[in-house]
C-alpha cells in the first residue's frame, strides 16, 4: 500500500473533510471544472484545522498554526550530513547516532520499515524521505539546489506548466 503519510498530507476522492465527502472525480462537486476545485484530484490536508471554515461567509475565530521546525527535520538534516561526511553507519564518541538510526527514527514514527541500504542507495533513501516527510513544508526547492539536481528535476516541473 501507500505510505501512511500520504493520507495525512492530502485529501483525495472519497475522503471526508468537514463532514463532507470529497468528490474530486470529473463531474463531482470538487472535480475539475468546478470553480475553485482541484485540477490534480488532491487537496492539501497537512496542518489544516478541520474546524476552521475558510468560506467567505464564516467568521475566522480559530487560527491556523503552522509548524516552522520539526524534530523530524532535525533528524533528516543530521542523517544527510552524517551520510555526506562519513557513511550511513558511522558513529563515534561525539556522534553516537548514525545517519541510518536518525533516518529510521523518522520512518518508525510513520510506521514505515527501516532502511537497510548503503552507499548511493542510502543517500537516495534520505532524499526520498525528505521529500515525503517534509512535503509542503517549503524544503524541496532548497533541497534541489543543495543537491545540485535541478537538471534532473526540471522536466518534471516544466511538464506541469501550461501557458
Predicted regions and their residues:
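Acidic/polar-rich alpha-helix caps and helix-coil junctions
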Residues: 1-161
Amino acid at each position: 500500500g501507500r505510505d501512511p503519510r500520504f493520507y495525512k498530507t492530502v485529501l483525495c476522492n472519497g475522503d471526508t473533510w468537514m463532514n463532507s465527502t470529497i468528490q474530486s472525480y470529473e463531474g463531482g462537486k470538487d472535480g475539475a471544472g468546478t470553480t475553485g476545485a482541484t485540477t490534480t484530484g488532491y487537496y492539501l490536508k497537512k496542518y489544516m484545522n478541520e474546524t476552521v471554515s475558510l468560506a467567505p461567509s464564516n467568521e475566522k475565530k480559530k487560527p491556523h498554526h503552522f509548524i516552522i521546525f520539526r524534530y523530524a527535520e532535525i533528524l533528516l538534516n543530521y542523517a544527510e550530513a552524517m551520510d555526506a561526511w562519513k557513511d550511513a553507519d558511522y558513529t563515534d564518541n561525539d556522534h553516537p547516532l548514525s545517519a541510518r538510526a536518525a533516518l529510521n527514527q523518522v520512518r518508525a514514527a510513520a510506521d514505515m520499515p527501516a532502511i537497510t541500504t548503503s552507499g548511493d542507495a542510502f543517500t537516495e533513501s534520505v532524499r526520498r524521505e525528505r521529500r515525503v516527510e517534509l512535503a509542503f513544508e517549503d524544503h524541496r526547492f532548497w533541497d534541489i539546489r543543495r543537491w545540485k539536481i535541478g537538471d534532473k528535476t526540471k522536466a518534471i516541473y516544466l511538464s506541469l506548466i501550461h501557458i
